[in-house]
Amino acid sequence: MSGHSKWATIKHKKAATDAKRGKIFTKIIRELTIAARVGGADPNTNPRLRTAILAAKGENMPNDNIERAILRGTGQLEGETLDEVMFEGYGPGGVGVLVQVVTSNRNRIVSEIRHMFSKNGGNMAENGAVGWMFHRKGDIVVPKEAATEDKILGIVLDAGAEDLRDDGSAWEVTTPPEAMEKVRDALTAAGITPASAEVAFVPQNYVKLSGPQAQQMLRMVETLEDHDDVQHVYANFDIDEKEIQAAVAG
């Protein structure tokens, strides 16, 4: 199963009491701005913006902050010029890594991302070298305590999901990109709150890691995710949940 979705679930729980909430706000504001710039300010016709607004409200972001971010995206409010960039690379053990960045300084971020790869046993790669290892899918993670397998399976398959996987402490639901919102809304209507729901780059296969390589890989992901300009990190590692919990606790 996907060790990376376990990481996302455990990190989500930790973030609720973490000093990193300010960074979460910054990342969501940038996503709102980019989503509005690319697809317009109307969430009814812009699925990416709809998802970003839901994420903002899930973090109790004030409506004024949401509206200002959208207005900056459409150019109605002045703000920094942001570029969206995807970097590709390899982590320990040949794990494929995609790093989605929103930045106001493309030259600076290239050198910083390269440094974060190299100091954690990895290296950056050319465009296309790693991207083929992933496909774009809806990815919904539901804590196991929220629902039984039978209950969640019936809901998500009826709503258009492709797959449900047991990922240790969570259920991982995979959907076509265009069905993600429908599946998420079906879960919510049934009283089931996902830990996360997004259109993501989901690995087509996984690289099993343990011991020092696993710890080094998790340090790389955490270092990348902590950077203000990094929106998402996708990686095809499979690491035992106990090792992930130990890394987060440490």
Regions found by a protein language model. Give the residues of each.
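N-terminal cationic and glycine-rich segments that engage phosphates or anionic surfaces
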Residues: M1-M116, G121-A125, V130-D139, K208, ...
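Positively charged, low-complexity, intrinsically disordered RNA-binding extensions
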Residues: D139-G250
